[in-house]
Amino acid sequence: MKVSVLVPAYNCASTIRSTLDSVLQQTDPADEILVMNDGSTDETPLILESYKDRVTLYSQPNRGIANVRNELVARATGDLISFLDSDDLWHPKYLEVQRNLFQEHPEAVAFWAGHINFYGNGEYEWEGESSGTGGTVELIPALDFFTRYNRATGPFSCFSYCCVPRRVFGELGNEPFKEMGAEDSYCCSLLALVGPVVYCSAELVAYRLRKESLSNDHSWTFGRWVHVFELLEERFEETAGPELLSAFQMAFASKRRSYAKLLMGTGKPSEARAQLLQSVHNSANPISIAKSLSMLILTYLPRPLQPSWPTGHRKWKGSENV
């Protein structure tokens, strides 16, 4: 079985070395590592050149991460395709675990591993030889996927901790990733149309958070997730079975409600109410409708009687200098 690793690289001079080193230090090495320089204007091309004997390098004018991923998927030859962003890090056993999951669950269309957040531009130190081991493994049916995704989006929101069998991309279409600021969530949701996914809770990926990252703004993130559902709605209506479509619609309504809370917390009541009204139309489920209408009523109460709405900004835990 052949494994391909795909790494988009854009203006990542401060992190790309540690990212590529984490790939090259795997206990079960990748068969090919494809790196695309997406029109970087910093020292990234020079750094990548120093790895040319160990990875396959490509370069193009800046077209965005979705385009890069689609290009690299088309060029990959592995049976299992692994993705890694240019600022995240893998535990040395990451590919070893993913290969085993692939062999144990040939019916699965994606394999996610657990991750841990870390802050700034520094390195992440894995704790001891036993780190990255253990955890539970779940096979999540397509019908249950949106329930899990809606309850905790984080485990499925980044492809740095996801591997996908190459055969699956033939079912997803020519452009499984779309440029919108939520490329991972778009492709992730598409996978539910194809089959079950596997989740291994062992923390095998270090996901880097930086102060300037848009992912620190939950309001922006939820807005992107709502947009993903808007783009996918027609495709699910046309191709999903009744039960999967219902699960998708309930998740869509729930994401709108979560987004509405954040809009209220950032002083945008008109936009929040628009989301809640749309959420009523997203799902015919009576409980979902009742939740949306109840929240809509709360937005019209005098401010002292309203709940404490979340503001949506992640509290920064790193150094102020990064």
Regions found by a protein language model. Give the residues of each.
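Short, well-formed alpha-helical segments that are part of the catalytic scaffolds
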Residues: 11-25, 32
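Acidic helix N-cap motif at the loop->helix transition within catalytic regions
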Residues: 14-17, 40-50, 89, 93
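A conserved acidic beta->alpha catalytic loop
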Residues: 22, 29, 37-46, 63, ...
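Glycine-rich, basic loop-to-helix element that forms the pyrophosphate-binding segment
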Residues: 60-76, 97
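Conserved nucleotide-sugar donor-binding catalytic segment
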Residues: 74, 132-225
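Short aromatic/hydrophobic "clamp" motif used to bind/position activated sugar donors
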Residues: 81
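Conserved donor NDP-sugar-binding/catalytic core segment of glycosyltransferases
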Residues: 93-129
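C-terminal subregions of glycosyltransferases and related glycan-biosynthesis enzymes
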Residues: 148-156, 180, 186, 193, ...
